[in-house]
Amino acid sequence: MKMPRSGLGAGLLFLLPAVTILSGVDGMAKYLTEVGYSVLQIVWARYLFQTILTFPLAWSRHGTGLLRPPDVWAQVGRSLLHATSTFLIFLAFARMPLADAIAIFFAYPFLVTAMAPWLLGETTGWRRWLACIIGFGGTLFIIKPDFGAFDAGALMALAGSVAFAFYIVLTRRVALRAEPAMAIFIQGLIAAILLSFVVAWSWRTPDLSAW
């Protein structure tokens, strides 16, 4: 399967603001771990707000069709992979500098590029590999991580990167049938529901600064 060139430019335009927003989420997660909130509670809140914020758009487009999403098990799988990845990288944030954790996590483009021919049937030429290398090098140059000690936090960041790579691959498959607003809403809903069963064990009522 080959990505249509007409969609590449639009994809990049959506990618840039998405990366900016996610960088803000990472910074807030790091702050919340530093002031004493558990990673489990932070991850739960992240998906709860995702569900609330995406529901109006998803409902306006699909209505009761949200109860019948396509590729249900693929939707569940991508939600579990994303929640696992988020949990692991937030754990890494709690144990190491933010820049170091993000630098390790950004190994995922290499993993996605390596898996794409086998799992998606997409062509992976030398230009894409070169783009990955240049992009990763640019990331390291900007954030200047310190890899003095590759500890448990670093392993969590790496494991999170692997989970996120599989999430990206599965999302590519789901995107062929599921409309984006529905897919994002379903992803947040599944994760929020599952985490609701365990978040009480590490609950701390948020104060004004946390909100």
Where are these regions (language model features)?
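Hydrophobic transmembrane alpha-helices of multi-pass small-molecule transport proteins
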Residues: 127-144
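Transmembrane alpha-helices of multi-pass small-molecule transport proteins
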Residues: 37-84, 163-166, 186-202
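Membrane-interface helix caps and helix-loop-helix hairpins in membrane proteins
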Residues: 91-96, 144-152, 202-209
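Hydrophobic/small/kink-forming positions within alpha-helical transmembrane segments
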Residues: 19-24, 55, 79-87, 109-114, ...
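Transmembrane alpha-helical segments that form core, pore/gating elements
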Residues: 30, 149-205
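Structural motif at transmembrane-helix junctions in multi-pass transporters
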Residues: 34-41, 88-105, 176-181
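C-terminal transmembrane-helix exit sites in multi-pass transporters
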Residues: 89-91, 108-130
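Loop-to-transmembrane-helix transition segments
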Residues: 10-18, 58-88, 152-160, 207-211
